[in-house]
Amino acid sequence: MVKSYTLAGLAAIACLLLAIGAVISTVYILNDISDFYSEAQEELVEFKDIANNIWEEMVFELTPEEMREAEDNDREKRSYEPEGPYQSETTTPSTTTSTAATTTEAAEDESGYDFVNDNGPPSSRPRKPEPPTMPRTIQGFRAPPPAATSTYRPPHGSNYDNYGREPASSRRPYPPQQPPSTSAPHSSPNNRTSLYNPQPPPKTGYPTNPRVPYNPPQPNYTRQPTYPEDNRAPYKPTRSPNTPPPRQPSGGYDSDGQTPPSSPRIYNTRRPNNHGPGYPEDQVPTAPPVPGQQRVPPTQTRNPPNPTNTRQPSRPVPPTSDGHIEATTPYNPSAQYPTGKRGSHPGFGPQRPRPGTRPRGNPCDQCSAQPNHCPSGPPGPRGRPGPPGFPGQDGPRGLRGLNGGYSGVQPSSYDPVIGCVQCPIGPPGERGPDGTPGVPGEDGIDGEQGVNGQDGQPGAPGAPGYHGMNGSPGTPGKPGLPGRNGQSCKSIPGPPGQPGVMGVPGRDGDPGTDGEHGQDGSPGIQGPPGRDGTSGPDGQPGVSAPGAPGTDGGYCPCPKRSSKFDFNDAYNDDEKRGLEEHRPRGYDSERAEEPRPRQTVRTNTYDENSGAEHQRRPNYEPSAEVAPPRQDRYEDEERVREPPPKRPPPPHRQTPHELYPEEQPYVRRPPPPQNRGNYEVERSREYVPEAPRPRQGYEHSSGYGGDDRKEQPKYMESRPVDEPRYETDAPSRSRPLKKVEIIRHPERGYDRRQPSYEDSKPRQEEPRRYETEAEPRYEEVPRKETHPPGFGRPKSEENPRETGRTYSEEAMPPVQQTEKYNGDKRKKNQPEYEDISKPEEDKERAMEKHHKKPNKFQEKQWEEHRKSQELRNSREHGGQVPVETSVPMQQVKPESSAEEKPVPPVHDNFQSSEKRAFSNENPLPSEQIPYRRRNRFYRNHYYEKFLV
């Protein structure tokens, strides 16, 4: 108990320590994660600041040469932009100059940057000062939502196309080029201040915000409705202006900005549009080509690729929501167009003006046409970054490289601009041959001393030494402590032991008193009929008077009577005339029919059916007359009528026909009468005119048999019938024939089951079990037993066949008839009697089934039993060893008798000739003991111990 408590306490402490360690480690991990997150946030903010200020640092670090190259590249890019959308036919130079004079002060921004003469890319403009609380963000770091799902209104005076990009019409227009007399803003190479403080050239009237399109005062156009100043207010499509279609490049000016392109347009090989000479992207102006340089076509085309131009891109023109490119005209933002239905949302997508519509008049146009001299207000908050732009066009092809010289020879010419050509390092050459071995080096320092090896395994134990002398006895130890008091407990009984050896059988007990008389057995098998008794004395002579003629005696001879059936003759003269008319042709009705003889089979033995006929086809004599085929039911009825028998029927005896339903007549039996004692009750039954079926054993009596047929045995004869009763009442045509009831056994009554006619294959003939003899009592044929005693028969009579006793007919055990012998398989409801119909050839099979080969346990038990029997016999003979003799053992009398005979020794192979029922290589224990112990041992020991 103490150890278990100690182990439990240690386990609890260990679990507590593990839990504390897990909590501490979790806290440390969470702290590290929080520190890492805070450092990542700081680094991200720092990265944003660096990314937002990187362009300013790059601008300050540019050299004049790099600035010139940037100007050239930017000018070439701007040459692909469309012409100014604000130069219309109604716009005059005077209006532009007047507007420029009034908006000179507004041309410059507060930061001092001139948006008019800006030649750099839009991203190179200096940013406006932002409030310190507004964080800087780089473009593209926070992508805005698409224009169709954006919650913010787009900038004033602009819209987005399907790619989330502002069209070219809403961008800052390219300002007209200045005359050549005007100096360039970046002419001085070392003047960095001129980048932000250029000389103010003649200004034109452009708005302050470069992203807001310029809207000069034009009296012929209405002004677009303005939005509130808050650019971050949510956009509502209900108050959205008429959105113009997106602008597509539709031509422009050459590099000077004033003259149309001098070089011919290329790649204009497609099908022209309906509104112009060709597609708008085919009219993109190009700069004059540089000598020795190939022109690169614009990227927004779908022209076939040029195999000679390896730098030509294949990016298609961004289509509109309609799926095709439209040829547009210069867009006037002051013109009002109705909202179209072609876009996915009202106010977005390509909107076309409806033909025949007029711009609406606005009364505020007169007020808004006045010049605005109000000072510019403070800069608004920084807007959301725009969507990322399309990738830029590829740069021009580089200059042609210098001609290289031979290996080891410098190039003949030197270009001061390019300088020396820096060639990359080539691949390593092949490995050269190995050199000669060098001088051996000096000896190294001695190493440390090694670790000692491990000890070897202990050797095998040696041989035991000599036994020494015993030592002197030690001193007695101290008495031990008294033990604990014992506890009383009840032990569980152990398992039962193995059965002991069987003891010597005890002596026979005194004979018991006779038991009660047993009940009578069931009636046995119906035996053959007995012999006829002696004839009785003759009766008194009858009245000597002539008999009166019968009903039918006046017109035809009477037919022969039948021994099976008897019908009441109830035909009148009218019926007879009908029968005469219905007779077939060629049939002599007046001629008396000769009865057809019938061949019957005479047998001297009884078959298994105990009275049934042999199923054989009847053999007719060739001279027998065959009746014509049946024509109607009347003719058949005539055939059925048979004459009465000549002699009276014998007294009624129970025949086998009354025991089996298949032996009944072919007609359905009437239901049993209410009064079972009266067996002569007649029941009217309508006769079915159908010829009776013949049986397989003998021909059915149908009117063609006579006196000359062979006489059958008495037990084969049909059931006797009463005398026919003829009705002498008035004849009636509708009165049916009546059938005489058959007298049945008074105890059995009528069998309600239908008779079964066996028309299938005939039964196999089996030998009879009894011979026909004169004695009324029969003795069973002695035969050897096929079952051990006490098995397969009632226990009340175990060996009834051994004494040769006879059985009466009433005491014979009933055996149900079976079609075929199925070995020893007994039916469920069959009584437990020995099957005496088993043939001799099944003897070996029965032996194998009931006497199997014993196992080892049985052999051991039998051997012990044999030894005990020998010991008992030796004691009875005065201790002498029994001698094996072939003398059969005599039955031992009870010890209470006066004379005692010596019992001969038991032989191992002893079997009485009268008691031997089988032969087996391994005899059972019941065969090695006297007969007086056989049944007792067999019943109590064999079945209870070995079989269970």
UniProtKB/Swiss-Prot annotation:
Signal peptide (from-to): 1-25
Organism: Caenorhabditis elegans
Physiological role: Probable cuticular collagen-like protein. Nematode cuticles are composed largely of collagen-like proteins. The cuticle functions both as an exoskeleton and as a barrier to protect the worm from its environment. Acts downstream of the Wnt signaling pathway; perhaps in the formation of the adult cuticle. Required for proper strut formation within the unique medial layer of the adult cuticle.
Protein name per UniProt: Cuticle collagen bli-1
Family annotation (InterPro entries): Col_cuticle_N, Collagen, Collagen_superfamily
Biased composition annotated in UniProt, kind: Basic and acidic residues: 507-519, 563-597, 630-645, 679-698, 706-787, 794-808, 821-847, 856-878
Ranges of compositional bias, category Low complexity: 88-105, 180-189, 293-314, 454-464
Subunit record text: Collagen polypeptide chains are complexed within the cuticle by disulfide bonds and other types of covalent cross-links.
GO CC annotation, single: nucleus
Similarity section: Belongs to the cuticular collagen family.
Segments of this protein annotated with the region Disordered: 65-934
GO term, biological process aspect, one: collagen and cuticulin-based cuticle development
Disulfide bond recorded as keyword: yes
Region spans: Triple-helical region: 377-408, 426-488, 491-552
Example GO molecular function: structural constituent of collagen and cuticulin-based cuticle
PANTHER family for the chain: COL_CUTICLE_N DOMAIN-CONTAINING PROTEIN-RELATED, COLLAGEN ALPHA
Any Pfam family hit: Collagen
Disulfide cysteine pairs (residue numbers): none
Cell location: Nucleus
SMART domains: Col_cuticle_N
